[in-house]
């Protein structure tokens, strides 16, 4: 196991002026590396401890997570009548057969074969799950004609310890989400040629990754306030955040130990492979995925993929929650589950719906023959 520990005294290679003025060394003798001692408070040193050993990590309350998941199930089911079809689903990940739970939301009045556009909607994390907080936006998607699948990929909460500890950030979780496409294609009323993907934060990270694969089944993607660069991210996040990555079996190390692994798992380094339209919205006052990280993706997309990328930077949008601008477009009253709109939230969602409608055409019922278009007199 490897670790980093900030000691009470940190030794750094430096040569003070006084040391440089010492007596000249004998010819042929290598210069000594002089040391300078920098004192550090012991309490601060304790805070800077980082370990990638699983036994050093704080335990999760799995019973509480499972209970919260049951409450989410109940709320989503209770609000479904007259609004949307709701179903708890499972499917096997195509990478290793792991059972992936999720939700299906669909219009009550189904069209015929291939009648509906569809989307895979990816929740955030690091450890997280699909909750009722996104319900008003999902309802609007269904009203617009979309069929929605929301996978709880490996590492999600509410499904027990083994599933939680199977987290593989930027690894097998991508395949878990990708396999949701196969589930959608198994539904006769879903058009396999009109499937999109979107997500926020960690969900935006997964969305961007899958959009930037050389071969992707998605026709369009929206990544909002996405994690983009794990190498850089771990340089400005604290030890607790670093532990959550470095302890994962698929990573098992910090960026300085496994730089290639972190690069492989960072969407920023795969922009060149993007070949579908993508929408990216970020906020300058984001206190989770800080703008200093997201601006790298925005600039690179604008430089390399201007014909495929639609990007917008929201300058200090109305805050929501502890992460300030991170949830600027997910402002929902936790009690009523109604939108708490701000100008930025309204603008972001309007742009998102127009983006997807331009590409996926959710209002088109392709189970019916396309109407004939007159080409001239008598036609």
Describe each PLM feature range.
Residues 25-108:
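Non-catalytic accessory segments flanking enzyme active sites
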Residues 78-101, 105-193, 198-201, 235, ...:
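Cap/lid segment of the alpha/beta-hydrolase catalytic domain
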Residues 125, 284-286, 317-318:
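Acidic beta-to-alpha connecting loop that harbors the catalytic carboxylate
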Residues 180-236, 373:
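Primarily recognizes the serine-hydrolase "nucleophile elbow" in alpha/beta-hydrolase
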Residues 219-220, 226-270, 276:
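Mobile cap/lid helix-loop segments that gate and shape the active-site cleft of serine hydrolases
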Residues 274, 280-282, 286:
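Short beta-strand/loop motif that positions the catalytic acidic residue
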Residues 287-296:
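Conserved alpha/beta-hydrolase "acid-adjacent" motif
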Residues 295, 306-379:
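C-terminal catalytic histidine-bearing segment of alpha/beta-hydrolase fold enzymes
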């Amino acid at each position: 196991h490897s670790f980093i520990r900030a000691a009470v005294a940190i030794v750094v290679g430096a040569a003070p002026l006084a040391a440089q003025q010492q007596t000249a060394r004998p010819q042929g003798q290598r210069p000594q590396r002089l040391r300078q001692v920098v004192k550090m408070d012991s309490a601060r040193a304790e805070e800077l401890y980082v370990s990638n050993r699983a036994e050093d990590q704080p335990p999760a309350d799995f019973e509480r997570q499972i209970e919260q998941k049951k409450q989410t199930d109940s709320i989503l089911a209770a609000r479904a009548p007259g609004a949307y079809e709701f179903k708890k689903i499972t499917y096997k990940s195509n990478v290793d057969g792991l059972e992936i739970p999720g939700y299906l939301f669909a219009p009550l009045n189904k069209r015929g074969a291939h009648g509906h556009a569809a989307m895979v909607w990816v929740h955030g994390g690091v450890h997280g799950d699909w909750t009722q907080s996104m319900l008003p936006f999902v309802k609007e998607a269904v009203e617009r004609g979309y069929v929605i699948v929301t996978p709880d990929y490996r590492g999600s909460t509410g499904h027990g310890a083994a599933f939680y500890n199977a987290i593989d950030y930027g690894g097998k979780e991508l395949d878990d989400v990708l396999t949701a496409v196969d589930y959608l294609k198994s539904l006769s009323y879903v058009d396999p040629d009109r499937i999109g993907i979107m997500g926020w934060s960690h969900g935006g990270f997964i969305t961007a990754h899958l959009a930037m694969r050389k071969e992707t089944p998605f026709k369009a993607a929206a990544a909002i306030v996405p994690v983009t660069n794990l190498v850089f991210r771990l340089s400005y996040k604290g030890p607790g955040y670093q532990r959550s990555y470095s302890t994962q079996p698929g990573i098992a190390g910090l960026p300085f130990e496994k730089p290639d692994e972190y690069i492989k798992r960072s969407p920023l380094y795969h922009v060149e492979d993007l070949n579908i339209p993508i929408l990216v919205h970020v906020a300058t006052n984001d206190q989770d995925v800080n703008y200093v990280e997201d601006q790298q993706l925005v600039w690179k997309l604008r430089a390399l993929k201007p014909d495929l990328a639609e990007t917008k930077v929201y300058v200090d949008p109305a805050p929501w929650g502890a992460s300030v601008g991170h949830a600027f477009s997910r402002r929902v009253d936790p009690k009523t589950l109604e939108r708490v709109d701000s100008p930025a939230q309204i603008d972001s969602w309007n742009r998102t719906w127009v983006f997807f409608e331009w590409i996926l055409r959710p209002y088109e019922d392709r189970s019916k023959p396309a109407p004939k278009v007159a080409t001239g007199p008598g036609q």
